[in-house]
């Protein structure tokens, strides 16, 4: 599938492509002749990028692989050979653990907002949404839940309330990806130079939403697929991650659908997601309290007082245990806040 071309008929500025002072501060005098380029598509054997001069197929050094790069990365490229000289440190990075894989898989980089897309049907799954939220929090992006297929649900408002209760100050938007009004509903996150990414199961409307957001800026629309009515499962219509221009001036990254997401190294993301539990942990009598049987446990006290949802606690425990098992080094007691600031930079 071809990439979209420039945002406008004229050459885009670096700011149009998502460049900011964060990346400019990383430039050195020796980089003066290199071209800042944003990775727009990652294939198994090649990369494509966008710069002020347009779309370019990029070359890699012999020791490098495409797996080292994510859509949204900023790289410095030699102008004649199109050889990638180095990658700039990421402002944010979305990555997921692949079942059976040796390490995390890069999903997208330098994303400002993560649209977590689900439907008002059998696809709606609280535990899965919490995993996506932990991923977004850890990455340093702003999560927004998008609810599709509300027109087919008996009580779409009930879905919205369930989603909004998952995390403090969480934005939830109900929309129909097929109508132009969907772009207007998301305009606050899709301004010039802003980058959003879509994540969710197959068949929830991600590719349709990409087409709506891109509008006339996209030359080759994303393929879309129907879902099976009996279980709300869809077909994979997106097989590669790619960067698309949004009609309003921003950028959107589509990702292949995923129904399973293992967590790893998302301690800060879990702490943010379950803030009501995180805030209770320092009040426990013992610093290494597991919140199961210890005397003076503030979490158990809140549970007995009815101010803490037992199902929420059970999901926190399951997610925390999985994260601890999958993370090579885990420091601090369960529930303690991560010492580092928000998000990862690599």
Curated annotation (Swiss-Prot):
Span list, region Disordered: 317-346
Cited SUPFAM superfamilies: P-loop containing nucleoside triphosphate hydrolases (SSF52540)
UniProt GO cellular component terms: cytoplasm
Intracellular or extracellular location(s): Cytoplasm
Enzyme Commission numbers on file: 3.6.1.-
Any one Pfam family match given in the protein's UniProt record, by short name: RsgA_GTPase
Gene Ontology molecular function: any one: GTPase activity
Keywords: Cytoplasm, GTP-binding, Hydrolase, Metal-binding, Nucleotide-binding, Ribosome biogenesis, RNA-binding, rRNA-binding, Zinc
Domain CP-type G: 98-261
GO biological process, one term: ribosomal small subunit biogenesis
Obligatory cofactor(s): Zn(2+)
Cofactor details (free text): Binds 1 zinc ion per subunit.
Residues annotated to bind Zn(2+): 284, 289, 291, 297
Job description of the protein: One of several proteins that assist in the late maturation steps of the functional core of the 30S ribosomal subunit. Helps release RbfA from mature subunits. May play a role in the assembly of ribosomal proteins into the subunit. Circularly permuted GTPase that catalyzes slow GTP hydrolysis, GTPase activity is stimulated by the 30S ribosomal subunit.
Entries under PANTHER family matching the protein: SMALL RIBOSOMAL SUBUNIT BIOGENESIS GTPASE RSGA (PTHR32120:SF10)
Oligomer status and interactors: Monomer. Associates with 30S ribosomal subunit, binds 16S rRNA.
Annotated HAMAP family: GTPase_RsgA
Protein name: Small ribosomal subunit biogenesis GTPase RsgA
